[in-house]
Amino acid sequence: MAAFSVHILGCGSALPTTHHHPSSQVIDLRDKLYMIDCGEGVQRQFRHEKLHFGRLIHIFISHLHGDHCFGLPGFISTLGLLGRTGTLHVHGPEGIERFLSPILEQFCHRMPYQVEIHTIDASRHALVHEDKSVKVYSIPLSHRIPAVGYLFEEKCRARHLNKAAAEFYNIPLAEYPLIIEGSDYTTPDGRIIPNRHLTTPGTPPRRYAYCSDTEFCPSIVPIIQGVDLLYHEATFMEEDWARAKETFHSTAKEAAEIARQAGAKRLLIGHYSGRYKDVQGLLEEAQSVFKPTIAANERMRIDL
């Protein structure tokens, strides 16, 4: 099975601390890298993780609060210094172009590569990117400004060819792609061979959902139903529930409740408030509702 892993580059929130970096993650799927959010200092974290800059083609920004996007100017500049030539695609909600275009014009106008900016409607659940390896869907979140989560779903073959059966029926190689996609096969004498006799079920696609920043938002549950791993912000503990509501963030308990309702296989919490020196309390609070919870930490890698 191809690699599908999530690297945590930063899991802190807006206030800088000595414990955590601002939000950023990298998904490694079939030798391609996809970044989600780009907090300050992300280049250093990228090197710590021994990730290859050239394998990154797409960056997905959740919203335009600084702890999620202030790393973009430096990261984009670094790619230019490294001699990048391939286009970099930056996806984000309304305002991403107003934020990034003046910076590119002022500081990055002589770079050896292009940056393409793609604006996402944060109010809609939609397919926002597709390539040979993955489909990426937007997840409408509820925050103080437009915010969007992302659902990554790997692309798998719908069916696996039973080569012994294909050879038995003398099926031409040219017919294999259609059979793998689910078609029956008609022999030269007109006999129909059902697809189920020629294939076996495909591997279910692995799915990863990133939901930050957001207040408690049950409307996302149908979108993320059954995901293999859910990252959900857990900025506060329940004892600070009033502050969570005031700032449109979630508590660890609320993050766990979303995971429970969605039937997620595992929950990864992060985006910790700087008021907590130790995240153990957040982890225990989440685990009291949803046992398979992991507390994110820098340089952590989670395999799906």
Curated annotation (Swiss-Prot):
Supply the InterPro entries for this chain: Metallo-B-lactamas, RibonucZ/Hydroxyglut_hydro, RNase_Z/BN
Which SUPFAM superfamilies would you find in this protein's record?
Metallo-hydrolase/oxidoreductase
Q: Which residues bind Zn(2+) 1?
A: H63, H65, H143, D213
Q: Where is the signal peptide?
A: none
Q: Where is the active site?
A: D67 (proton acceptor)
- The main enzyme category here is hydrolase
Give the record's keywords alphabetically. Answer: Endonuclease, Hydrolase, Metal-binding, Nuclease, tRNA processing, Zinc
Residues that, per the record, bind Zn(2+) 2: D67, H68, D213, H271
Q: How does it assemble?
A: Homodimer.
What function does this protein fulfil?
Zinc phosphodiesterase, which displays some tRNA 3'-processing endonuclease activity. Probably involved in tRNA maturation, by removing a 3'-trailer from precursor tRNA.
Give the family from UniProt. Belongs to the RNase Z family.
Name this protein carries in UniProt: Ribonuclease Z
Organism name: Porphyromonas gingivalis (strain ATCC 33277 / DSM 20709 / CIP 103683 / JCM 12257 / NCTC 11834 / 2561)
Q: Which gene encodes it?
A: rnz
